[in-house]
Amino acid sequence: MPQFKKKPVIIEARQFNNDSESYELVHWVNEGQYARGVDVPFATWINGNLIIPTLEGDHTASTGDWIIKGVAGEFYPCKPGIFEQTYEKV
């Protein structure tokens, strides 16, 4: 079976800590969605979770999850363990 290696790509990411800085994180996601011209509702911070609407449906980030801005400007959450295995700080 063929194997593939992930291309080295630099991404932007912020950790969701469910604290006062979460307002800034929500603004960052919403500003990015607006800049891309994506017709989805705004991200919201509800009951300690961050809800990120995407064209595929809502994604929920919990405390400690990383919010990634992908290569196409899309936003999605990533669990801390997966993030640590996949990314390193540049």
Each language-model region and where it sits:
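N-terminal domain-onset segments
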Residues: M1-T54
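Short, compact, well-ordered microdomains
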Residues: T54-V90
